[in-house]
Amino acid sequence: MSGVNEIRSSFIDYFVKEGHEAVASSPLVPQNDPTLMFTNAGMVQFKNVFTGVEKRPYSRAATSQKCVRAGGKHNDLDNVGYTARHHTFFEMLGNFSFGDYFKDRAIELAWNLVTRTFELPRDRLVVTVFSEDEEAYGLWKKIAGLSDDKIIRIPTSDNFWSMGDTGPCGPCSEIFFDHGPNVPGGPPGSPDQDGDRFIEIWNLVFMQFEQLPGGERLALPRPSIDTGMGLERVSAVLQGVHDNYDTDLMRALIAEVAELTSVNPDGPQKASHRVIADHLRASVFLTADGVLPSNEGRGYVLRRIMRRAMRHAQLLGAKDPLMHRLVPVLVREMGRAYPEIVRAESLAEETLLLEETRFRRTLERGLSILEEESTGLTSGGQFPGEVAFKLYDTYGFPLDLTQDALRARGISVDTTAFDAAMARQKAEARASWAGSGEAATDTLWFSVRDEVGATEFLGYETEKAEGVVAALVRDGAVVDSLAAGEKGLVILNQTPFYAESGGQVGDIGRVSGEGGVAAQVVATQKKLGDLFVHEVKVETGTLKRGTALVLEVDHARRAAVRANHSATHLLHEALRRVLGDHVAQKGSLVAPDRLRFDFSHPKPLSGGELAEVETIANRFVLRNEPVETRIMAVDDAITSGARALFGEKYGDEVRVVSMGTDDGNGAPYSVELCGGTHVKRTGDIGLISVLSESAVASGVRRIEALTADAARRHLNAASAALAGTAAVLKAPVAEVEARVATLVEERRRLERELAEARKKLAMGGGGEASGDAVRTVGDIKLLARRVEGIEIKDLKGLVDEGKKQIGSGVVAIVGVTSDGKAGIVVGVTADLIARFDAVALVRVGSEALGGKGGGGRPDMAQAGGPDGAKAEAALDAIAAAMAG
């Protein structure tokens, strides 16, 4: 029985033969126990069975339970890699009795397994019992035939187990393997018990009491059994090695690390090989169970594990991402026992690759800062907690990674100051957000943010990922679920969906997952700076908190947005080259169907300038050069020439997007600080077509443009229209512009002639004013006429013409428009201004037309009214006013 897989199978097979149900491992994320970060023992999935809350169709069970201890009080992370038996991920073999057999049968089954099935020498086995458990002491003597010196009484809580302050509890009995006197260490309970000579391989818990508040214990009517055997530990014993990392499974992983790094796994860097092997298992199994790296909760613990391994890969000299290349070996070794990692193999590889790629970009700078800040520290010194927090907050360095990097130098970290900095940041964030325009939902989003943490954005690297529903909101309140047909807001632990910001619209797409749930993502917004909120409409199933989902961004739409966003960068720089360095971005809209770019410039662009801007931008599109993104300190980025845009708030670390190569000096053509999504190469933009240029405000201009397919369709339509025009004109395309210009000028000439003809016709054909249009009011001539087909702006010209015709008098002309409204102009010849005021007369006419007011000079005034049908009445009213 040499292999770990055979040992696991033998354990399960043994208990199945003894009437136990083989129960599959439960997930690493406890399904019904919010008090636990991760499943850390075999009994976790049976907790409700032991307490009587849940019934199972069997009373005996055997499992091989996957476990993680890397957070909370069960945190082995710091020791992993440096000791023989510490792990973040491990397997716990166990057999359980739910009110069926008890101590005697449990001891008999355990003894027979280790001595008969596993064939461990009896004389190398030692057991412990709780000092008050005389029954267990007697049973070991009776069943196993152990002498008194092989049964050790332990008076401490090490041999008394409890589920909590209240609930089931009972004494324990542990089985130890003695490696012999050549190995340092003493027996359990002795001052030297922490040595490697005596290794615990199995713990039997006899649940026989119920702990009541106040300290009283009652005997359980149906006592139960819970046992746990560490597979890694017992495998080391059975394989004759003293170190869990020397078992066949771990050596297979370590050997692959050594192969890929060309570093001796048993040399000075042995610990790094072990860290990677252990953390690989935790990373893959957690990913398979729906945990993905993030900055809060379980995802943060996973990120710490991954990044600690990645840091050790870097110490081994790995130049490229390493962790994802180890996944196939792990799947080969453990996939038969745990088929979930077979199903999740590609997801695990993708997640590890993305995480390591992201981490490597910031690792070098973070380590440089760590080195600078710790230069004056020597062994025994303490690294400032505030600096450790900056490394965490700005560069994604978990605290334990900083501790691990300083460990070799004997330097500790001031964790109290680290915690204080963390608390201070949260308080400042709340204060700075006050009055930001989201007051109505501040409390809600801060509450959600505190509970679920920041959303991890994956969209720079992928458009499809897996995520877990962290919170749901409907009608301004947190809810437990969203049913089919309902709309609401979904917050995920991580997302590939870009949230609207920096002028770029948010992504849309679909999510789907377990239980047949599917929903449309119709918008993605950002709250509090780092909380991504997905507006969804559930189509089928029910979205619940904790639901694992496949997240798919609308690829075509995202591609169009990327093209438009990258085009704004090219256009921005082209505008600076054509118009001058005063050009600065003042706003933008990056949508899938178009782009809009606002910039500072004092006057309209000429046609030549606009064409030159478009030509320059398209020159870099045609070159199809790479678009590069770097993560830099904001000060370094700006010093290097990157353009920081208006109104943007930047952290200590920024994304710098560069594209194109300048013809003059070989430097990047465009370099900007930008958090948006971009094409991989400028050629992916396809084409840039500028549609228009206009004014937005004083000193601010706007250009609108299309890219890619939208630009192509626009140009195709324009080309078709041009060809159609040429056909109508019966002229070659090259002559269309000149022919159209000629036609336009001819039209204008004809329109002028027509207007003159209408004026003459309106005034009686060009001679003296016709008698029927001239009235005599007292001794004053009044030329009053209603006209149609004359633009209102031309009425003054008609009045001037009328004044010439009558020599002395008043002229009143009402022009009726095609929509039934009217304009009225009144003129008074110079000799009569002392008697008649044109303004007063036009107001009388306007009132008759249903209007109010009017204005002008005593000799010429204008007004209007909504009712052109009252034109004659208006003229009569003016005549009456003159007579009055």
UniProtKB/Swiss-Prot annotation:
Zn(2+) binds at H565, H569, C674, H678. Its cofactor is Zn(2+). InterPro entries: aa-tRNA-synth_II/BPL/LPL, Ala-tRNA-lgiase_IIc, Ala-tRNA-ligase_IIc_anticod-bd, Ala-tRNA-synth_IIc_core, Ala-tRNA-synth_IIc_N, Ala-tRNA_ligase, Ala_tRNA_ligase_euk/bac, DHHA1_dom. It catalyses: tRNA(Ala) + L-alanine + ATP = L-alanyl-tRNA(Ala) + AMP + diphosphate. GO terms for cellular component: cytosol. It is an enzyme of class 6 (ligase). Keywords: Aminoacyl-tRNA synthetase, ATP-binding, Cytoplasm, Ligase, Metal-binding, Nucleotide-binding, Protein biosynthesis, RNA-binding, tRNA-binding, Zinc. Belongs to the class-II aminoacyl-tRNA synthetase family. This is Alanine--tRNA ligase. The gene is alaS.
